[in-house]
Amino acid sequence: GITLPNRTGLPTTMIRSYWELGDILHFDPDTARRNIELGYYDTRRAMGYLRGCAYAVSTDARSCEDAAAFDWKFTRLQKAVREKYPVTLTADAALLLANMKDAQLAPLEAAAEDAGVDPTVFYTTRTLAEAFLEKCDRERIESFAPLFEGSGNAAQAARAALLPNTFLQALVCRALTGPVLPEVIEE
């Protein structure tokens, strides 16, 4: 990277890609094409035209509403599961380790990255969610379903703790596809 200080006095914005860009000494047209696309999106993000950290996500009103709705569902689901099975806190650690800056999209982006969603595509919150659902291993993450339904056991909770990234994918999948959590109504 650039290690010399900026002595010109001109405003400068350093842009660092979230993604590994590959070996610059070995020229490959596909890698160059990918790096150009990622660089374009990184620049647009730095200028405030895109949101997200790892993925280029639209800042239009609909996409922002979808991100807020996803965040609302995800937060409530995560809280409900954590209260019943405290050992599942490791999903929080997986999210922190992903180091995503956009709090509303962070779980979706981290899960999409783990699932192998293409970062060189422009997404809305909805299309990123669809791409994640298409790429994720549904059979594997559905094994965590009893934890969301309240019928899980200690072994399943321990498995969630041992596989925090997979459990994070399961949380995201459930937030995207599952029912809205019922509110507790006291009479």
Q: Whereabouts are the PLM-identified features?
A:
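Patatin-like phospholipase
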Residues: G1-E187
